[in-house]
A protein has these predicted regions:
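Active-site-facing alpha/beta catalytic cores
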Residues: 123, 154-157, 203, 286-287
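N-terminal [4Fe-4S]-dependent radical SAM core
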Residues: 92-121, 138-139
Length: 504
């Protein structure tokens, strides 16, 4: 698991974001094209300490494509000449800009890794029993130079040989991006390179964070956001519960609030406030619909990848997906109600929130979406050291229930606590799944009628939001930090009255 590790791929990605943020803050349309052209040479040259590829020319070619994606633009076609800055006029704005699809494989960066297969390693002892030969149904294994050898032409990739080897000498080869994708959206193009089937993709970003060559990336809105901030627009941040620890182990909410103010934000709200509203609403929804038998079960909807996957692959359960506002939207509408002249920026761990914010029903509520990773790059572009800033007050005070939404199981737990408190006579049955592969399994069970009466939480990322594609730290550290933040909350659950807030 590479998430949270400071790898070369990660440093490359963040450096591109930092340079693009600088372009946005500079906000000079007259020099934009030249500035974009200069970035690959600035990042990759003879003095570059980090060697991104075996050739500076290939490295620069990859940086150029990353640069386009970070500007919100699509990759250039491989079979015809298109200038690096083609289309930049459309993205050179201070409003949300998005060209589908969100996730793209950079062909020049993909190493065309082998797909699933098995290979004998040097751990093989050439044992007398050779159980690998005995169990192979196709006779694909023979002894060569005293070691087992797999004939790839005969091998059917069943894995039986690996399962019986007493030395664990047979390695399973899998494409990392393919292995990470829970909806089988990664296929191969005619050159054997990874390609994303957008009909299946739900934009969770797990392929992106698991590719060791950094060949997959999503599109960003940091350029447009930086432009808006540089123009002095009234912009308010809403920050997701998983923020704890993401900007440094000793960085507090007051540090973050002050640093965002230095960047140009007018105010900062916790998305956990919207989660509090959602927990009460979902509790009522469960009691009103599932307990009465009107619905067989209730699926949470705060994770967009989970909700989109359910709609794409399990259309029969669409009616069971909660229609309550997600925490991001509930918080954004609260902000717009109090500050109708402001733009709202969601800062979170999630790549697929960018798609949620582009929906027709949401786009007027959330003006920009950036990840923790992208926000850190924006701080870096401005030379902001968060530890040097501290606000007089923290965020608006949310409850532990709402803050717990950031961890797998936390959504269902918050709703369950609200039901136990406000509907004490109701027995609630809870199930949850994390990671899209597990989510598919639980939806299969639900569709088969085996989870009737349940409140079912799904999280697209293994670990929940704290393990999202746009996070900065290892999952274990994030989980520990969030648990402490939840524990230190002044209130455990929200008052029932929050359900009466009009946000529709």
């Amino acid at each position: 698991m590479m998430r949270g590790l400071d790898t070369t791929v990660r440093r490359l990605r963040r450096k591109v974001f930092e340079e693009v943020a600088r372009l946005g803050f500079k906000s000079n349309p007259e020099t934009l094209n030249d500035d974009m052209e200069a970035i690959p040479y600035k990042m990759v040259n003879e003095d570059t300490k980090i060697k991104y590829r075996e050739s500076v020319y290939r490295a620069r070619a990859i940086v150029r494509e990353r640069l386009r994606l970070a500007m919100g633009l699509s990759l250039r076609p491989e079979n015809k000449p298109v200038h690096l800055t083609a289309g930049v006029e459309a993205s050179n704005i201070s409003d949300k800009y998005y060209e589908p699809p969100l996730m793209q494989v950079i062909p020049s960066a993909c190493e065309a890794c082998e797909e699933k297969g098995y290979e004998v390693s040097n751990m093989c002892k050439g044992c007398l029993a050779h159980p690998c030969q005995e169990v192979c149904p196709k006779g694909a294994i023979s002894m060569v130079n005293g070691k087992s050898f797999i004939d790839q032409e005969k091998c059917i990739k069943c894995g039986k040989c690996k399962s019986v080897c007493p030395y664990d000498a047979i390695a399973k080869k899998e494409r990392p991006c393919q292995k990470a994708c829970g909806v089988n959206a990664i296929v191969s193009d005619k050159y054997g390179r990874a390609f994303i089937d957008n009909d299946k993709c739900v934009s969770c970003g797990m392929c992106m964070v698991n590719c060791p060559f950094g060949a997959i990336s999503d599109k960003s809105q940091i350029f447009q956001l930086a432009r808006a901030l540089s123009q002095g627009e009234k912009i308010i941040a809403e920050i997701a519960p998983a923020f704890v620890g993401q900007f440094g182990p000793n960085i507090t909410p007051r540090n973050i609030k002050a640093a965002l103010g230095e960047l140009g934000f007018s105010e900062v709200y916790e998305v956990a406030l919207g989660a509090d509203i959602g927990a009460i609403a979902e509790a009522h929804h469960y009691v009103d619909k599932v307990v009465t038998g009107e619905l067989p079960f209730l699926l949470t909807s705060c994770c967009p990848s989970w909700a989109v996957m359910a709609k794409k692959f399990f259309p029969d359960v669409i009616d069971e997906i909660s229609q309550e506002l997600t925490p991001m939207v509930a918080t954004a509408r609260t902000i717009k109600k109090e500050h109708p002249d402001a733009k709202v920026v969601f800062i979170g761990p999630c790549a697929s929130k960018k798609l949620e914010a582009s929906r027709r029903s949401v786009r007027s509520d959330v003006d920009f979406v950036v990840t923790f990773e992208e926000m850190q790059a924006m701080f870096d572009a401005k030379g902001i050291d968060l530890s040097r800033y501290e606000a007089e007050s923290s965020f608006h005070d949310a409850t532990g229930a709402g803050r717990g939404y950031g961890c797998a199981g936390g959504v269902a737990e918050a709703i369950e606590k609200c039901i136990n408190e406000y509907y004490p006579d109701v027995q609630v049955n809870v199930e949850h799944a994390e990671g899209l592969a597990e989510c598919r399994k639980i939806l299969t069970l639900a569709k088969a009628g085996k989870l009737n009466g349940c409140l079912i939480e799904g999280m697209g990322c293994p670990g929940g939001c704290i393990a999202g594609a746009g996070t900065n730290i290892p999952v274990a550290a994030a989980k520990k930090s969030l648990a402490k933040y939840v524990q230190n909350s002044s209130r455990t659950i929200p008052p029932k009255e929050v359900a009466e807030i009009e946000l529709d």
